[in-house]
Amino acid sequence: ADQWREEVWNFIKIRSDLNFIIITKRIHRFLECIPEDWNNGYNNVTIYCTCENQKMADYRLPIFIDLPIKYKAIIHEPMLEEINIEKYLQTGVIEQVICGGESGEDKKCILKPSFYFKIHFFIL
């Protein structure tokens, strides 16, 4: 990805009429990968941080919350266990949370409704 990253950022800037979603599980590398004129983000870019379990949420989300990103969202997919993100949502910087299960014949975890109901109530 490094060899074409600058080209992609230029395209995103040029196409301000489109909204771009960037999904990453490597949020700790974010500052290494943004363009010089990023400031606190582009108006047409939302960054999604993935967290599949509580351990990763507690590692990635504090980093994510502190980054200069205008539009922030979380993806729990595959959501492998119940995840408590209440303290991260209380910051007011997370605009959306998406939850999804694991797919395929070899899936290790079946998403239980209780996993996402708790997150739903935190958001309300």
Predicted regions and their residues:
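Conserved AdoMet/S-adenosylmethionine-binding subsite of the radical SAM
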Residues: A1-I123
